[in-house]
């Protein structure tokens, strides 16, 4: 597992011209630190995805501590921009840290995601899975959010995010759980009949288009 526990990364390279029509199966973009590795200062720009279930999956977990530092990993300072995704499933974009290992400083800008939809509202909380294998199904195949689920994370900017459901969906477009400093601007939602586009639990300092959410 050297790549998931390493604290030394070279993100200076720029990867272009990734082949189109590349079907990933689970998550189109997966950022995972579960063995103590540090992932920071990465930009994802100008990406179009099809044939995926979850557009973006960001997971910070405690499967193992780093063998050198004895610490859990870090995920911070990531930018996602100019992204479109046509998903074939119902599991939304996930940003999930842990109660003691929080994901910080993430920007989602100019993103359009399309999901199958057709789900009922979900009232139960997602289970923690602190040592599970990192993949979009690790918290279950159901999710309380139709387009974006954020848990154990701080300082997230969501700007010009458009969520579409092909079938009428009862879930809110965004669900926030134990999150702070979440700033949402220009959110668009199509196909959701939830009473609120955004639901939250145990959160603080949430703003939507500059207005504080209580």
Describe the function of each predicted region.
Residues 1-214:
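Extracellular/periplasmic carbohydrate-active domains that bind, remodel
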């Amino acid at each position: 597992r050297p790549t998931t526990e390493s604290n030394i990364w070279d993100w200076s390279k720029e990867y272009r011209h990734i082949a189109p029509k590349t079907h990933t199966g689970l998550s189109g973009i997966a950022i995972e630190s579960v063995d103590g590795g540090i992932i920071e200062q990465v930009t994802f720009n100008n990406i179009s995805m099809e044939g995926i279930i979850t557009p973006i999956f960001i997971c910070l977990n405690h499967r193992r501590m780093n063998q050198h530092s004895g610490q859990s990993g870090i995920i911070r300072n990531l930018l996602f921009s100019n992204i479109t995704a046509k998903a074939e499933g119902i599991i939304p974009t996930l940003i999930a840290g842990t109660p003691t290992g929080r994901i910080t400083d993430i920007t989602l800008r100019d993103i359009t995601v399309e999901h199958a939809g057709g789900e009922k509202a979900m009232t139960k909380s997602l289970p923690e899975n602190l040592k599970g294998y990192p993949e979009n199904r690790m918290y279950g195949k159901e999710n309380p959010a139709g387009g974006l689920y954020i848990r154990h994370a701080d300082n997230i900017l969501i700007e010009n995010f458009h969520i579409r459901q092909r079938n009428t969906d009862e879930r809110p477009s965004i669900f926030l759980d134990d999150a702070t400093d979440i700033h949402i601007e220009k959110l668009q939602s199509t196909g959701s009949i939830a009473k609120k586009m955004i639901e939250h639990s145990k959160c603080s300092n949430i703003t939507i288009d500059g207005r504080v959410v209580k």
